[in-house]
Amino acid sequence: MARDKEDQNNENPSIVQNMSFPFNTIFLISSAIFLVTAAFWFVAVMTLHYRTDECNRFVTTPGIFISFSLLAMSLTGFYAAYFKSDCLFRIHFFIFFLWMFVVVSKAIFVIFLHKETNPRLFPGTKIYEFRYEDYSGWVSRLVIKDDEWYRTRRCLVKDNVCNRLNHKMPASEFYQMNLTPIQSGCCKPPLSCGLNYEKPNNWTVSRYYNNLEVDCKRWNNSADTLCFDCDSCKAVIIADVHNTSFSITVNIIHIIFSLCIGMTGWFAWLRILRESQK
């Protein structure tokens, strides 16, 4: 009787296979969803990239790389699961490991950036100031490239980031303003310079002038100069990258989600290999 049952199982191998978890089906569905999403994102980013000016392309350029990587990974994963192709699975996981390397590296960078972004509240005001020297050398070099700073500077001037501070206001009102990081670092001199306040973008030398600080010498009342050449301006650009990056929690969730999809694909691949050996 036991032999009859064994023969029945051999005649109906699909019963045993159907009892196992359907990793291949789940991976096929998830890859299809990823494929549609990545394709839509890729088209949207490419369209936005060619419609924006040079100043905004530093945002869309990484988006092209990310969306193309997701598109390639999803496409190979979908066809690998659909055709049960060992070769396509290998290509898929090669792209997946590259993707995970980028995601983990970005998460580490965000953690370091979060630890080093520490604005100081200037006494007696509501103005926070940023210091370029607070950032590690590798962090500052990664975000701020000296040979490309002129492009960033030109874009800041072109976008009129300091326009809000053009009108005259009392010093007491200015010192209680909630300035954005760029307004604080690029549109006014460091308050430690000891300059006399005339209006937000106009300051004059006083007897308390601090000529030892390099940024104090770089300040100019000209609308095309202001503090765009200051280290404080470079510091707030780094801080702005921190503010526009995903939070640490979101990065961790992103890593966990990617690993779950990757493990599902891995088990689907193992099952296909096992079936091909039978």
Swiss-Prot record:
Query: Membrane-spanning residues where?
Result: 26-46, 63-83, 93-113, 250-270
Q: What is its main location?
A: membrane
Q: Where in the cell is it found?
A: Membrane
The glycosylation sites are 202, 220, 243
Q: Which GO terms describe its biological process?
A: auxin-activated signaling pathway; lateral root development; primary root development
Keywords from the UniProt entry = Glycoprotein, Membrane, Transmembrane, Transmembrane helix
What stretch or stretches form a coiled coil here? none
S-S bridge residues = none
Topological domains, Cytoplasmic: 1-25, 84-92, 271-278
Q: Which GO terms describe its cellular component?
A: membrane
Name the membrane topology term: Multi-pass membrane protein
Q: Which stretches of this protein does UniProt put in the Extracellular compartment?
A: 47-62, 114-249
Domain of life, per lineage? Eukaryota
What this protein is reported to do is described as:
May be involved in the regulation of cell differentiation.
Similarity annotation:
Belongs to the tetraspanin (TM4SF) family.
By what name is this protein known? Answer: Tetraspanin-13
